[in-house]
Amino acid sequence: MKENEVKDEKSVDVLSFKQLESQKIVLPQDLFRSSFTWFCYEIYKSLAFRIWMLLWLPLSVWWKLSNNCIYPLIVSLLVLFLGPIFVLVICGLSRKRSLSKQLIQFCKEITENTPSSDPHDWEVVVANLNSYLYENKAWNTKNFFFNATDCEKMFRTTVLEPFSLKKDKAAKVKSFKDSVPYIEEALQVYATGFDKQWKLFITEKSWSPVGLEDVQLPKDIHRSKLTWFLKRIFTIYSLPLWLAFLNCICVSQHFCLAFRILCPGLFFLMMVWLFQNMRTTALLVKMEHKMQFLLTIINEQESGANGWDEIARKMNRYLFEKKAWKNEEFFFDGIDCEWFFSHFFYRLLSAKKSMWLLPLNVELWPYIKEAQLSRNEESLMKK
């Protein structure tokens, strides 16, 4: 009897394992070698690419019948070089258009599966939407979303940010029409899931600083902020830009004095702006880093300039340990840290439109307010 029971238990375990395997979600990221090969496949399957290929048929006939090859050559070069650009633009627009027509289904999937900002929570949404869009002929392949991150990004740019920026009900109805109640429900579910993730991050996943006594701020190491800045930008990664800058200086020598001063000057200012904002790729890409930054600000007991110095010191160590930055010199000092928070976080609360190349981080708005209030309250208590 016992042997039969053991056999039955083993058979049940095998069946359950097979059921789990059959229920395993297969995404395009599991089928393609990389996002680039997936992207090339989607372009190949698009209508715009086929039209571009068909354009070569009349061009080849024109080449054969024309006595003057100059005009066919010019048109062929235009089709060759401008054609791929138009194909990419049209594919991007058709992708947004296809999803905008299925916002209700998109929001229903989010409401049913309750994903948070964790990419793994979006895998079910990706699988369901890929199948739905293909079966309803809204997209010509089963690979609309490459992975969970791609789906979450589209949710932010298509639903979360545009809807959150609308100030009143009339503006929302005008832009989203019948999708408004579904979007509101989906956003409420998403906000609830993100709040749970925030609380879980505080209790289990947050980083605790250890051995900060030996951590020095760059202001204590370098003679000035200029030397720290120059050390950061004179790297192998910036070599192409510096070569372009030197080329700009050489070329401008053949022009008038005003142009020789203006051209290199503007180019150098552009480089300074670029390097000043290059840190955004380290801190603003991963949600985990942004949450840790806000949590560090909220939990800091020290007030005023000393408090921001401590926050800068902790974040310098954190980003170095997480390999998000190559050294412990991400922030120069507390003033630099406060500027970064004000420029890339607090300013989002009053944003009227999406910022260029930067996410609005709508789900972080309550915690950004909390971080700002915590610094203001500590400064008031000190007074």
Curated annotation (Swiss-Prot):
This is Protein COS7. GO terms for biological process: protein transport to vacuole involved in ubiquitin-dependent protein catabolic process via the multivesicular body sorting pathway. It is found in: Membrane. The chain crosses the membrane at residues 43-63, 73-93, 233-253, 255-275. GO terms for cellular component: endosome; fungal-type vacuole; membrane; mitochondrion. One of its GO terms (molecular function) is cargo receptor activity. The lineage of its organism: Eukaryota, Fungi, Dikarya, Ascomycota, Saccharomycotina. Belongs to the DUP/COS family. Its main location: membrane. Keywords: Membrane, Transmembrane, Transmembrane helix. It is a multi-pass membrane protein. Residues 64-72, 254 are extracellular. Residues 1-42, 94-232, 276-383 are cytoplasmic. InterPro entries: DUP/COS.
